[in-house]
Design a protein with these regions (language model features):
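Flexible glycine/proline-enriched surface loops and loop-helix/loop-strand junctions
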Residues: 81-83, 167-174, 185-189, 279-288
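Active-site SXXK
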Residues: 36, 42-43, 62, 84-113, ...
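Active-site Gly/Thr loop motif
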Residues: 236-296, 325-380, 415
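Short, conserved catalytic-motif segment at the N-terminal edge
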Residues: 27-88, 110-113
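Low-acidity, Ser/Thr- and Arg-rich intrinsically disordered low-complexity segments
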Residues: 5-8
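Active-site-proximal alpha-helical segments within enzyme catalytic domains
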Residues: 138, 183-191, 290-311, 373-390
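Short, gly/Ser/Thr-rich active-site loops of penicillin-recognizing serine hydrolases
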Residues: 308-311, 324-335, 395-415
Length: 415
């Protein structure tokens, strides 16, 4: 498939009128020949799916074949530019998992090893037998923190490590799955600090060993020098859309202060900890399960490397084969004690494609984010995909804008 330098179709598609996007908004960017359906789906999202502003990028077998952006990036209706970045919430989890995959390829980490081998203090409170694989599959029973944790604790990695080490699993590790909405990244971060010879934070490692190597704008620790003018602000769904869009059971769980998902996502520290009213997003703070900020281009490029052999990041084939392998269930099955369903499966820090929520081939791995963001690698098709948006949707999985783009992509590939 030819890349953009070998014959690019420039997309200057006027968006149709809609509530979310004024008619003057333009979709910018390009698609390589044969990928026109993706451009059309991106434009239609503004008219059909209340898109406000966003971007979509696709790498195919190492070549960038789709790079689109459009709409507006804030309530002042300033345009979404080529280099606009936005927080991607839990799509960050896939980026964090990439850091551990790089560490695995370097021989620093064994997914089957007990975490306490690398981090001895972790062994207390019945955590001595938890393996790296179990943690990354949300099977460690550590989905919530039992003591107050705020931005000050998160910013002090040594202090945070002490808090993490003294947590008690909610049940016997390896028996159940429960979405570690925010805690997963904290545990990953300390694990990486223990195995990295330079003891870098997860955000620093990602920046130096992945984002900078690829020349892309994606951050797990947003630096001070990034101006607000490069950042898109999130537009939440209306109260009516939230009431009608979220599954009733999920709404009830989110409102119940004793529920697992409330404890995992709403408090201690809560998903709003990385939002800053004056600076859009908190700077120099790492919440590796949710505070990633970047472009669709950066996300797609990183996944594209994982989908096409990993040469740029010196990934071993053994690592890539493990990421593509099926998820291993806990002893009680894939029913998730936080999300109250069994349609989602995790493996080695990534979400896996399942019949209940498919993306790409069965060997694909990636991570969606609250509101609609998505990134994944499909090693069978050689696809690295990234989609980001400022208009938050209400679907827990399978945002219709993302689905429309992926359907158009695989239609273009005739897969």
């Amino acid at each position: 498939m030819p890349g953009p330098s070998q014959g690019t179709t420039i997309a200057r598609v006027m968006c149709m009128k809609s509530v979310a996007a004024p008619a003057r908004d333009v979709v910018h960017g390009y698609v390589s020949p044969g990928f026109g359906p993706v451009r059309e789906a991106f434009a239609e999202n503004f008219a059909e799916h209340r898109e406000l502003g966003g971007a979509c990028c696709v790498y195919h077998r190492g070549k960038k074949v789709v790079d689109l952006w459009g709409g507006v990036r804030n309530k002042q209706s300033e345009p979404w530019e080529q280099d606009t970045m936005v927080v991607v919430h839990s799509a960050t989890k896939g980026l964090s998992a990439m850091t551990l995959a790089v560490a695995h390829s370097r021989g620093w980490l064994d997914y089957e090893e007990r975490i306490a081998t690398y981090w001895p203090e972790f062994a207390q409170k019945g955590k001595d037998r938890i393996t790296v694989r179990q943690l990354l599959a949300h099977q460690a029973g550590l989905f919530a923190l039992e003591e107050p944790v705020d931005r000050r604790v998160i910013a002090d990695l040594d202090r945070l490590a002490v808090v993490l080490a003294r947590q008690t699993p909610a049940w016997e590790p390896g028996t159940r799955q429960a979405y570690h909405a925010l805690t997963l990244g904290f545990y990953e971060g300390e694990l990486l600090r223990r195995i990295d010879p330079r003891h870098r934070s997860l955000g620093q490692f990602f920046q130096e060993e992945i984002a900078s190597r690829l020349g892309e704008d994606v951050y797990l620790r947003l630096p001070d020098e990034i101006p607000n003018s490069r950042l898109a602000t999130l537009s939440p769904p209306t109260p009516l859309r939230m009431l009608t869009g979220f599954p009733l059971r999920a709404t009830v769980e989110f409102l119940n202060r004793r529920s697992n998902i409330y404890r995992a996502l709403v408090i201690n520290p809560g998903s709003s900890v990385y939002i800053d009213e004056e600076r859009v997003y908190a700077r120099n703070l790492e919440v590796p399960s949710g505070c990633g900020v970047g472009t669709a281009r950066g996300i797609a490029h990183a996944y594209g490397v994982f989908a096409a052999g990993g040469r740029e990041l010196e990934l071993r084939q053994q690592t890539l084969d493990l990421l593509a392998a099926p998820a291993i269930p806990p002893t009680r099955g894939f029913y998730d004690e936080c999300m109250k369903g069994d349609g989602v499966q995790f493996s080695l820090g990534f979400m896996k494609s399942t019949p209940a929520w498919p993306f790409g081939s069965a060997r694909s791995f990636g991570s969606p984010g609250a509101g609609g963001a998505m990134g994944f690698a499909d090693p069978d098709a050689g696809i690295g995909y990234g989609y980001v948006t400022s208009q938050m949707g209400t679907e827990l999985t399978g945002d219709p804008r993302d689905v429309a783009l992926r359907d158009a992509l695989y239609s273009a590939l005739q897969l």
